[in-house]
Amino acid sequence: MSKVIQKKNHWTGRVHECTVKRGPQGELGVTVLGGAEHGEFPYVGAVAAAEAAGLPGGGEGPKLAEGELLLEVQGVRVSGLPRYDVLGVIDSCKEAVTFKAVRQGGRLNKDLRHFLNQRFQKGSPDHELQQTIRDNLYRHAVPCTTRSPREGEVPGVDYSFLTVKEFLDLEQSGTLLEVGTYEGNYYGTPKPPSQPVSGKVITTDALHSLQSGSKQSTPKRTKSYNDMQNAGIVHTENEEEEDVPEMNSSFTADSGDQDEPTLQEATLPPVNSSALAAPITDPSQKFPQYLPLSAEDNLGPLPENWEMAYTENGEVYFIDHNAKTTSWLDPRCLNKQQKPLEECEDDEGVHTEELDSELELPAGWEKIEDPVYGVYYVDHINRKTQYENPVLEAKRKRQLEQQQQQQQHQQQPQQPQPPQPEEWTEDHASVVPPVAPSHPPSNPEPAREAPLQGKPFFTRNPSELEGKFIHTKLRKSSRGFGFTVVGGDEPDEFLQIKSLVLDGPAALDGKMETGDVIVSVNDTCVLGHTHAQVVKIFQSIPIGASVDLELCRGYPLPFDPDDPNTSLVTSVAILDKEPIIVNGQETYDSPASHSSKTGKVSNMKDARPSSPADVASNSSHGYPNDTVSLASSIATQPELITVHIVKGPMGFGFTIADSPGGGGQRVKQIVDSPRCRGLKEGDLIVEVNKRNVQALTHNQVVDMLIECPKGSEVTLLVQRGGLPVPKKSPKSQPLERKDSQNSSQHSVSSLRSLHTASPSHSAQVLPEYPPADVPAPDQTDSSGQKKPDPFKIWAQSRSMYEDRPMSPSPASGLSKGERDREINSTNFGECQIPDYQEQDIFLWRKETGFGFRILGGNEPGEPIYIGHIVPLGAADTDGRLRSGDELICVDGTPVIGKSHQLVVQLMQQAAKQGHVNLTVRRKVVFTVPKAENEVPSPASSHHSSNQPASLTEEKRTPQGSQNSLNTVSSGSGSTSGIGSGGGGGSGVVSAVLQPYDVEIRRGENEGFGFVIVSSVSRPEAGTTFAGNACVAMPHKIGRIIEGSPADRCGKLKVGDRILAVNGCSITNKSHSDIVNLIKEAGNTVTLRIIPGDESSNATLLTNAEKIATITTTHAPSQQGTQETRTTTKPKPDSQFEFKGPQATQEQDFYTVELERGAKGFGFSLRGGREYNMDLYVLRLAEDGPAERCGKMRIGDEILEINGETTKNMKHSRAIELIKNGGRRVRLFLRRGDGSVPEYGGSNYENIPSFPGMTP
């Protein structure tokens, strides 16, 4: 709400003063009720009409009304005082009593807890009233906390020091008026005693400190408590959100007793009910009240046993104590017959006298009059913001529809009946979406179509379930189980699987599907359990432990959790994310709110509302309704969702197109929404009927779907979230329409305008970077200048604006042929999409540092990248920074082409200041095929639109790959501790040797199978003569994997020098660039080879050289396909063999079993997936079990821990396996050379750079 409207409707405008004289017998005729001991403001009870006349200045004035809140009595501020103190103040007045009172409203009512749990700008009347309440409460009550006493603190005076259990019991009993967490400790303000202690009330002398405007105050509380109170203050528009510590102003007493000092901003607190959690939605959706105050005041009382509550951000939500549920939506609006938008009258100039309400806007809409940006409208229920009056917009659309219907009706008799279209043809554009099929699906499971009416089936008896029962066992990783749950918000509602998290335990297990009903957890039946109860069960399971789940398949979700027109559903992500603390409760981030906090898909961006055209006109955009998070999320992790669709007479009801970034087919348009329930535009199709289709061409996928008989059911596994799909320039749209008839898109989206998009698509999130500067027709002023985004104005005015994660927009719709035509056209420069997008990121430093690592900058001109993001660190909490981002500036200082050391120094300076402003750029994953004779660029992405992208590739940092053996950083300075090694290949290639091309083709699930060795520590002697120029060739074949495509082709030998990859010269390229070139080549790579000098082969694998196996497996599914290890033995060349001692080769691999000693197992580790390296033995403790066994040595690579492979294993997982293995640990190792690889970056955390562990 803008400041102007807030000022008009603010409660301070309703405050009035009234003087009441006593009667002849001293009676006042005014009854005072409430009081802080009841958790209420003092308020007026019964009033004698004759005595209630206000007499300011001797004349008649306003009267006291029953129910009005008393703010002052005889100049004494009484808010927060118990009733007996208020009566004491009144009794001290002999003849007349002056009251300052205010009528109750939506924000200020008699509930003290409600008012204290709101957040206000410091210095505002609301904030001052909160401080008055607290000051008065402290006169009788001592705040309580769970932290230990500090020096000089007196128990019972400064604080009542309680255990966590005692505190939670106290909160659950309703004794605490205000509760919160600060720095990992609970704080609370209890109610005053119901009776004054020893019969004492506030003395007359003490009243002076309560006089309005008095400079005196109550005894000061300690700093930590004041900090806790101040942390709830809403900042002004110009203040940074990080200016004050984060704080939870309320929490749920039964929501866990996790003792974790790290705090995240809370979403919604419960009010006066410890058993209820507030409705949970994507935390990026921080909106003010869903109804304006004016609407709340005119809707009448709430239904029985309903309660209105407020979050710490002032957001309204509602508690149904009958069903023990919470909701964003006002039940008064749900029960009220809402007037259709088009039937409302224009609200321009229509206002009520008192509250300036817009009478003709439907419930849930709010009109904002901003003095700078003008008028705009907020739909709080469907969460959208627009400039256009929604009533006028609805009338205009209805009029347009009527005109179109009339035109169609006039043309219908003159046109022959069109033939029945094929499911993938353009004829769909004129076909009315068919209704849901009436025929049953082909499988014996219960029908998957949603019930047309009535309450969905529910039972608490598992034997009454009719679907297919599935049993699965999942191990909880450090990031959870990897699935999200919806439901359980109504008394009789199933808890069902909403989606799986990519690469999470549930997705890797492969048994769970969207819609599966959770029947039991560890043999405990949970049918009928609430959402919060089941979440608590999952959260109580320790990391590393397993859970047995019984699921029932056959009951579809009774609602679409992504549909903005349905009620928001409380959901908690039991997913593969780091746990965070919200309201004292361990929970996990949402996959939808966090396109991937860990940066697994490194090209995801936080999304912000774009232009008003995106907000208002394009209804395919809106706010994310993936209600799957309890705390601030940072990016959206890809979800795997199962959708069942029955093929109807007109087909499946959706169209597909090539994914612009490669990786398969995306859903381009939903033609038949009822039939495609659960499917969304932009979804990437991973499997069709359990068959992976990411490697198939567009036509192959279309043929597969066409072959399905009508009436049969197809099961689609789709990936939602992940790589963003850039928008096309408007200049390219005519080209798309022109060529759409001959394209392979099979899409009709070109025939849809911005204003006719289906409302069901509005759950997609607005992109952060707006498209080209083209405003929508109805979003421009008379001068043609684009208006600012109304949502941004509104959200900033509420001091709640923050970034939103980006969901994928629908596929851009360009087929391969169209993209080729676009590129070769003269308009290419106008429609070209930039390769990079830049972003400024401001970070506050935490106690543990900025929480990210810096990589690169070791060679002149080498880019500097963001490496590992520390979970729960400053960068992770902020959420915008991603692993792989290229660093452009640090606090305004450009660092492009600068050294690693300079960036380290800049970061150290920033650490002293406590904050840093980073400018980063992120590559847009959208590439177009090169012209036929054009040389590919090493920075290009996949060259084939049909090439499936391996998501494991996205985990690597740009300067090296996951496949690197030792180090991925360039320069000899990064190889310290590895050894200098012997001389490189020194043979000179004769001038008579001619280069030749070798083409290697690989299968779907295999790598190319060769190793490139790049000499970086000294100049190479191998040369060739090209154009009389002597060119060094530092890159050569180091290994060939037996049985691999490189081995089968028979044209490569160890020692061969590589001149070019896919026609691109690599003589001056870094090792990582070559690795990326080959990875991006798809299934075929062409190498230009000069036969090598075999005399140099014996020194190819020295430690000073960088080695990387080019065996990237472009797996269509990320579940179970791993990259080939670099430890594979090379196939001995026909003229060369390794001649190492036989005894050494026998000991290359060995197993040890260690028994835990008094100080652990006596060794420490280095490496892990998060550091882009394998696991190595870093140190051996003197006289420890590892040293005493006599086999283990520093530098040995750990291949298995307790039988579990370490391939792609995280460092934390390795420690977890060792710690949870009991008294013994069994290790399978490969003998190293005594050196341990260094990490490839600098660490900006105040934790050990190399998290070695001596378990």
From Swiss-Prot:
Residues 585-601, 938-950, 958-967, 1111-1129 have a biased composition (Polar residues). SUPFAM superfamilies: P-loop containing nucleoside triphosphate hydrolases, PDZ domain-like, WW domain. Pfam families: Guanylate_kin, MAGI_u1, MAGI_u5, PDZ, WW. The keyword Transferase does not apply. Residues 17-105, 471-553, 642-720, 840-922, 997-1093, 1151-1233 form the PDZ domain. Residues 300-333, 359-392 form the WW domain. InterPro entries: GK/Ca_channel_bsu, Guanylate_kin-like_dom, Guanylate_kinase_CS, P-loop_NTPase, PDZ, PDZ_sf, WW_dom, WW_dom_sf. It is found in: Cell junction, Tight junction; Cytoplasm; Membrane. Residues 434-444 have a biased composition (Pro residues). Residues 974-984 have a biased composition (Gly residues). Keywords: ATP-binding, Cell junction, Cytoplasm, Membrane, Nucleotide-binding, Phosphoprotein, Repeat, Tight junction. ATP binds at residues 103-110. The modification Phosphoserine is found at residues 357, 729, 740, 799, 1070. CDD domains: PDZ0_MAGI-1_3-like, PDZ1_MAGI-1_3-like, PDZ2_MAGI-1_3-like, PDZ3_MAGI-1_3-like, PDZ4_MAGI-1_3-like, PDZ5_MAGI-1_3-like, WW. Residues 96-287 form the Guanylate kinase-like domain. GO terms for biological process: endothelial cell morphogenesis; positive regulation of cell-cell adhesion; signal transduction. GO terms for molecular function: alpha-actinin binding; ATP binding. GO terms for cellular component: adherens junction; bicellular tight junction; cell periphery; cell projection; cell-cell junction; cytoplasm; membrane; nucleus. Residues 208-227, 235-265, 395-462, 585-622, 719-820, 932-984, 1111-1142 are annotated as: Disordered. It comes from the Eukaryota. Residues 402-414, 741-755 have a biased composition (Low complexity). Plays a role in coupling actin fibers to cell junctions in endothelial cells, via its interaction with AMOTL2 and CDH5. May regulate acid-induced ASIC3 currents by modulating its expression at the cell surface. This is Membrane-associated guanylate kinase, WW and PDZ domain-containing protein 1. It comes from Rattus norvegicus (Rat). The gene is Magi1.
